[in-house]
Amino acid sequence: MGKSAQPATMKSSRRLPRRWWEIGVILLVVVIIAGSVHVARNTAGISVGELDPIDRRALEEYSEYAAAVEDAPDSAAWLNAAATEHPTLLISRKTHFSYLINPSQEVSSPFAAPVDMGDNPAGLEVYRLDRIYPRLLPIKVAGGSFNTVGETTTVQGSDVYYLKFGEDNFDKQFSSEHFITFFAHESFHFYGQARWALDSRVFGELSPHGVELLDERMRLLDAVRDAGADQARLRELATELLALEKERLAADPDYVSQERWMETVEGTATYLGIMASRAVGYDFGPMYFDNTKEARFTDVVPFLESGQIDNDFLRNRLPYEAGAQLCLLLAALAPSGEWQAFLNEQSLDSHRTLVDALGHVFGQEK
């Protein structure tokens, strides 16, 4: 039995490599066929109507905003800093597909499928990139939600601004994280503020007199909002604001200086989010919160004194809202965009704030 078993074992071992070779050939054929089908499908392209509803909505909203920028750049975008004039990459957290919009270089890749956008107001050129596109795997796994200032991301030869999005960017009302609102805000930091100093935090607290002056400022900002398009009233209120700002700076110089800079950096970005929202019909503006819209600025100090909000709100949220309202005031008083040109001329070493821009519009240089 021992001798007869050996030849059988040797015979079996000689057949094993051949079996694995046959399995390997079959797998290779399957991979080649699947790859060929995939490449053929990508070459043929895909209709926007075939996309996941969230992905489709993001592309359609982007196209609507881009068309508004083309039609009315003075109101929908910032002077010389329109994000939609650059290649963009949208990364879907839901489907894990990515969408390359208006590439600067010709796209030729088995991982890229042209998307037929159909009724596309901005005439976008769009490619869907596969979930497993190797270049994007590090960004999907370890990258942030969007490009930060100074960060370069190149996809298919195009330097892009990327943004990740998901269902939560479409299912909330009055939200600064609504898709196009969020895109316009964050992309403005990238394209519009690359030469601005971005150390925009507020530390410390206002003095008791400073809180009183803040209350007066809140009253004026509500009055600005209530004035609508009344130019005479807006100019009157702007003059009062400039006078008040001198008092505030004298009372709390360090705090007010930090506040002015933060409301310039974040207020301008919030303003861009507001204009983008208006372009696509999404309801968003200054003092919008998850549970309410158009809250009154004049509620801030009473809420502070009653403990309903604390100084963190004054330091970390109010500059976004007050800055956006100042931008809307400047846009109403100087629709030609001279205030934006004024802010664009600043550098990393020389700050120009929204209060400075208001003084510039009124010929009151600092």
Please place each PLM-identified region on the residue numbering.
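Short, intrinsically disordered terminal tails adjacent to the first/last structured region
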Residues: 1-11
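N-terminal Sec-pathway targeting helices
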Residues: 11-30
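Non-catalytic terminal regions of proteins
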Residues: 24, 37-83, 88-96, 123-127, ...
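Auxiliary, metal-adjacent structural segments of Zn-dependent hydrolase domains
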Residues: 61-166, 197, 201-203
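Short pre-active-site segment immediately N-terminal to the catalytic Zn-binding motif
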Residues: 166-183
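Active-site recognition of the HExxH zinc-binding catalytic motif
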Residues: 181-193, 270
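Post-HExxH zinc-binding segment in Zn-dependent metallohydrolases
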Residues: 194-251, 255, 259-285, 289-301
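Active-site-proximal alpha-helical
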Residues: 254-283, 292-362
